[in-house]
Amino acid sequence: MEDRREALISKLMNMLVENGFSVSGTGFQPVATFDIVARRDVERYILKVLYNIDTLKQSTAYQLIKLAKLLRATAAIIGERTGNGQLEDGVVYYRHGVPISSVNTFESYLNGERPYIYSGPGGFYVRINGELLRERRNELNLSIGNISSYLGVSRRSVSLYENGSAATIDIFIRLRNILKADIVDHIDLFRINSTEINFEEKISDEYIARIIWLLQKYGLDTRPIFKVPFDIVAKDSDEISLIAALIGDAPEPERVRILKKISDVFEDDAFLVSKSNTYRESIGGCAVLTISDLESIEDKDALIGKIEKRAK
């Protein structure tokens, strides 16, 4: 199954490049929170690839949503199967609040064709624009009772549709045929409401806890990140995002390389924080700072200036 997942990652990366995206991967690590980051102008995506989407863990979904919020990106999972069979093209699925689709559906979405069908308990559904439904019904001089008779549903169901409830595919098609109008609520099914998620977490590593405290002192929303090639992500209220990794005396070259590539794709600053004092100012194109450096920096602008200077 891992071979199939790796093939799916390669297919997705090729598709993104063909559609004008800059991309970076994490090296096919099956336990990683994400597999690909991609950017095209202002579009930023953090993607996890699963052959079977039912294998998604809640902890992975949580980290993916948190990371996307901090990096001002859209999180999504690209898959191929559920426990019941192949993913249907043109349909968005959800697991633990994260949108999921096939490669073909995601490519269509990137090219402006927003899917409007989503998978829910018992089948596929379409969100109805209740206001348009009501307006069109009145234009045709149809009562709620008329519509309910045509559809074979209760008046209450029609009232719910007019209040924005979703309809099954069968009901939606019949309703569209009756009204001869586009009554789809064209919301972005890939949009995640992360405001309902509590991102507070216990931090067991004293170094990471210290770094987070120091970055928060500069007015940066700073969080730990797990199962990724870095440890901390911070952002301000404007357009600045920072990615940081804690390193020891012998940093892993592959980890640094991936960190640098991710920061290049997103055009965000990445830096390494050394646990001990070091003479090195950069490794692999990433600035190196110590805890002492962070303690002596006065504000956010000075921090960014030091990172950019040492990264050169």
UniProtKB/Swiss-Prot annotation:
Keywords: DNA-binding, Transcription, Transcription regulation. Residues 144-163 bind DNA. CDD domains: HTH_XRE. Residues 133-186 form the HTH cro/C1-type domain. Gene3D superfamilies: lambda repressor-like DNA-binding domains (1.10.260.40). PROSITE patterns: HTH_CROC1 (PS50943). GO terms for molecular function: DNA binding; DNA-binding transcription factor activity. This is Putative HTH-type transcriptional regulatory protein TV0294.
